[in-house]
Amino acid sequence: MFLAQEIIRKKRNGDVLSTAEIQFFVDGITHNTVSEGQIAAFGMAVYFKDMNMDERIALTIAMRDSGTVLNWDSLGLNGPIIDKHSTGGVGDVISLMLGPMAAACGGYVPMISGRGLGHTGGTLDKFDAIPGYQTEPSSELFRKVVKDAGVAIIGQTGDLVPADKRFYSIRDNTATVESISLITASILSKKLAAGLDALAMDVKVGSGAFMPTYEASEELARSITAVANGAGTKTTALLTDMNQVLASCAGNAVEVREAINFLTGQYRNPRLYAVTMGLCAEMLILGGIAQNEAEARHKLNTVLDNGKAAEAFAKMVSGLGGPTDFVEAYDKYLPHAKIVRPVYANTSGFAYKMDTRELGLAVVTLGGGRRKPGDALDYSVGLTQVCALGQEVNKDVPLAMIHAQSEDAFAEAAAAIQQAIIIGDSAPEKTPEIYRYIRASDL
């Protein structure tokens, strides 16, 4: 038997906690036998004194096991359970293509996603734009769709990782969100509760990223790779660029349109294609579906070209209650904004630098994101045809198309976009879409 205050004291003094002590404290979070004040103090102690990798692994496993851990054995699936997680960005629509692509290659993707908060969009919010789609299905329906379609993208259910829900809400109110140890455990406990064999982690870098610097993003990527592999799930992290909007758009319905155009081959934004392929290929390799990068890419391009990936998306949407002809007739079902109009730069030149975070906040201002949890969203609003860094803009080539519901909202977003995209006399140096891979062998 331990005392919560002694565990807090030990960590406050910079000592290493045992697995049993961490397990005891997490049990206390789950069952309300440690107080909010004690949880806040523990979070602050970890924030200042940190945890070593063994402590992080113990915390992740204890939080993962605080609720239901999904088990897929009874379904007799003939492929690996694989998934991807992103630290969040703007125009990051990857999940909508990657899940169906991996499924069409023989993987099973039970993706438990979140809603947007702050400047980043949430995968679940995009699916809420699809009429009838159930983001919170019963566990029976979730399992059925994973088996039949190979992929199901849903929200976190109440019985998964209850310790994280309580701990995170307290961290949010006590300025301890930014601890690498606690971020690692929070992300991975939720992901690993899905019963995964393998995980590809997308850690964003740049002006639209969650972590403020490249160094901090790399530290988080290393921590996640080490802890996930230590907890028994094969994991690779990719450091990817978020110094500009990833897709050609940002919002909810507008991103669903771009995802379908990508899957059906109507249009594939080259940066979006590069990052999606990098992550998805890594999932196939970790899951044993492909032996190497070349084989993985060949398989992925095949399912994009033969329509199997689009078919998996369609099966998932109809299986979770959406329209059966959604891929063919998506525009009939998705909401449209009243005003769709371009915003131009004040001078001609090249898109030189972007404050991607501010562009994400412009979508929030339009009504496409949340200022606080629980806010209702307008799924029709957002940005499309967002210029890429290095692109020439002038009186004929806009910075973006704004989808707004009122003239006031349009004007506010237009001013924010003009301020967020800096115009230069020449194109900036090109940055890579993927900076590096961090695999278990690199640690």
From Swiss-Prot:
Its EC number is 2.4.2.4. Homodimer. Keywords: Glycosyltransferase, Transferase. NCBIfam families: PRK05820.1, T_phosphoryl, Y_phosphoryl. The lineage of its organism: Bacteria, Pseudomonadati, Pseudomonadota, Gammaproteobacteria, Alteromonadales. This is Thymidine phosphorylase. It comes from Shewanella frigidimarina (strain NCIMB 400). InterPro entries: Glycosyl_Trfase_fam3 (IPR000312), Glycosyl_Trfase_fam3_N_dom (IPR017459), Glycosyl_Trfase_fam3_N_dom_sf (IPR036320), Nuc_phospho_transferase (IPR035902), PYNP-like_C_sf (IPR036566), PYNP_C (IPR013102), Pyrmidine_PPas_bac/euk (IPR018090), Pyrmidine_PPase_CS (IPR017872). SMART domains: PYNP_C. Pathway: Pyrimidine metabolism; dTMP biosynthesis via salvage pathway; dTMP from thymine: step 1/2. GO terms for biological process: pyrimidine nucleobase metabolic process; thymidine metabolic process. Belongs to the thymidine/pyrimidine-nucleoside phosphorylase family. It comes from the Bacteria. The enzymes which catalyze the reversible phosphorolysis of pyrimidine nucleosides are involved in the degradation of these compounds and in their utilization as carbon and energy sources, or in the rescue of pyrimidine bases for nucleotide synthesis. The gene is deoA. It catalyses: thymidine + phosphate = 2-deoxy-alpha-D-ribose 1-phosphate + thymine. Signal peptide: none annotated. SUPFAM superfamilies: Nucleoside phosphorylase/phosphoribosyltransferase catalytic domain, Nucleoside phosphorylase/phosphoribosyltransferase N-terminal domain, Pyrimidine nucleoside phosphorylase C-terminal domain. GO terms for cellular component: cytosol. GO terms for molecular function: 1,4-alpha-oligoglucan phosphorylase activity; thymidine phosphorylase activity.
